[in-house]
Amino acid sequence: MITVETIRERHSVREYDGKPLARAEFDALGAVVEEFARESGLGIQLVGDNPEVFNVIARFGLIRGCRTHVAFVVDGGKARCVAADEAIGYWGQKIVLAAQDMGFNTCWCALCSRKKSRAVVAPGKKIRLIIAVGHGKTQGFPRKTKSVETLSSVECAKALAWFAAAMEAAQLAPTAMNNQNFKITLLSDAKTVRIDAPQSGLNVIDEGIVRCNFEIAANEAGADWRWERDI
């Protein structure tokens, strides 16, 4: 079961053991991916034994020793779909946390060789990004984050305990280049929550990831709350 503790334990991992997932592991994770694909309506696929997708030339951000990934397949037009990006972040983070619960390590990867993925990509479609999945050489490490005060604001009389707990989870959400370009506001009714983020680049995917973490913690705290705008 995905909990706030799952969020705390999960860290990005870039170095893996170089081994493919065992068949039972792959099938179990594949069932989770298929379930979330059905619920979300997104094109999500688990792809095994495909290390070539991580072969890129870059000075940083490389994934080593990973053979399995989750691919997000979207419409192939040049125009970026904001709604799809936000959903990719939200549902992708659900997969990341479910994988953590199952004993896997993960890393969000915008930097990859998309054309080398063995995902099934129909004409007119493309891979938006992937998530590396496997057994890491380490469990990853905590990264530096912005303060909760920087990432949030409160318009009601006082901050509530559930909001503080949810903001801690949001603070731990992985974002591109660790930029954390978002702000979450508890509105004056002490129930409605607004999230603001730039609508460019990978920021909208990041917004979806943050939403997922915040939602898990707020619901675990038993809060009576709602988003100002649903996905």
Can you say where each PLM-predicted feature lies in the sequence?
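Acidic, surface-exposed loops and disordered segments
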Residues: 1-231
